Amino acid sequence: MQTAYSYVTFPQRSHESMMVCVSRKSKKTTGKASTPATVALERAGIEFRTVEYEHSSEHMDDGYGIEAAEKLGLDPKRIFKTLLADTGAERVVGIVPVSGHLDLKALAAAVGAKKASMADPRRAQRETGYVLGGISPLGQRTQHRTVLDSSALAYSEILVSGGKRGFDIAINPQALLTALKATTADIGTW
């Protein structure tokens, strides 16, 4: 059984709109919006929605996640970024709200390491298979141990990258934890 997609456009501001692609199980597929992240969720049978917006490379000083929050009209605390860190022994993924920062010391403690540093951006792209600004925690080329910031549990649905810029996945945080076999910890700072 494959997935079919239906698209609905929601007005946001007077001059912008957001396109939501709702995934549902079906015998037919249109082949739209398929990334390794969506394929991983479909194979696992986990419910999710995809949200698309027009990405602009202008004004990126605040980062890709803040751009998503602004264009979608959502609280940046509900949109999460995926960051790859290196503990020396292994690389691990930390998922934190786009409005905050990854606390590397807390991430290291959460995985039982003494310290952690941000992975080289080129290595992050190579190991995940995604471009910066589009790194999804799902469907990565190399699977890493993953920690989700515990603030995600306050929401019934959060957004993470769907595997490319301008393409996010809306998912229940418990479902995300299940899909990733991840743990939670207070790894975000504001």
Residue ranges and their predicted role:
Residues 5-190:
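Extended, low-hydrophobicity, polar/charged segments
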